[in-house]
């Protein structure tokens, strides 16, 4: 058994929360382990002037940490799973999917105003094309503004009056104790989340069996089934930060239900579909369900939507 572990992480407050959480959970199971954090600056942390969709690089928040993992400067990397591309570099693997937080998105607005009650042409801040597409399908009048930076920076911009409202993931807002600022939690019927939203992905080297054995204890089986189904769908649609795709899977007693959305950036076209599979006994079967639903979406016309978006990004 290893005596030391080095966790690689970004330095944002939320990333540090995630890494400290992972460290605490591992220490609880393996009190003899000496666990330290190594902070890594990623491309996504540096390029803050451009919208994520314009940068066009997969792995903006993960690649630089993965380099440290490949060169054995760290033993594991802790990521927000929604930031992790569906294809990991050769030699690396997502070993654990931690138990998921609430996957829904939230509205932060002045005076607690809900989405439907925001004034005409309200300035809504989000860096996500997925959110933009679904928002504009509901409220085509909204003036969508790009917002980058960590959660604290975003709240600062909002409090300075740059926007009327902003949309964030509940998980991050809750973990950094901003829950009292939430105006509305949006149900999945209104806003499907990003693939993997609310879960952490713990990445290791494939050949580092000792670390994988240690880290696997943090794996949450239900979350793994759900996230592998969602990630398989996204992979089959060849999506990423540049594509408006939402998905949410639930899994109970061997039954997996997966909901998905593919839409145009302006929200004028939106495809919804879902699939339910019973008797699942392996995460690979969950992935197969994700691929099957992706195929259905492609038959519905997702291909044309995605091709058009890729031409213009």
From Swiss-Prot:
E.C. number(s) listed in UniProt: 2.5.1.61
InterPro entries: HemC (IPR000860), Porphobilin_deaminase_cofac_BS (IPR022419), Porphobilin_deaminase_N (IPR022417), Porphobilinogen_deaminase_C (IPR022418), Porphobilinogen_deaminase_C_sf (IPR036803)
Pathway stated in the Swiss-Prot or TrEMBL entry: Porphyrin-containing compound metabolism; protoporphyrin-IX biosynthesis; coproporphyrinogen-III from 5-aminolevulinate: step 2/4; Porphyrin-containing compound metabolism; chlorophyll biosynthesis
Swiss-Prot/TrEMBL catalytic activity: 4 porphobilinogen + H2O = hydroxymethylbilane + 4 NH4(+)
One GO CC term, this protein: cytoplasm
Cofactor note: Binds 1 dipyrromethane group covalently.
Keyword Cell inner membrane: no
Cofactor(s) required for function per UniProt: dipyrromethane
Alphabetical UniProt keywords: Chlorophyll biosynthesis, Porphyrin biosynthesis, Transferase
More details: The porphobilinogen subunits are added to the dipyrromethane group.
Protein name stated in the entry: Porphobilinogen deaminase
Origin species: Pelodictyon phaeoclathratiforme (strain DSM 5477 / BU-1)
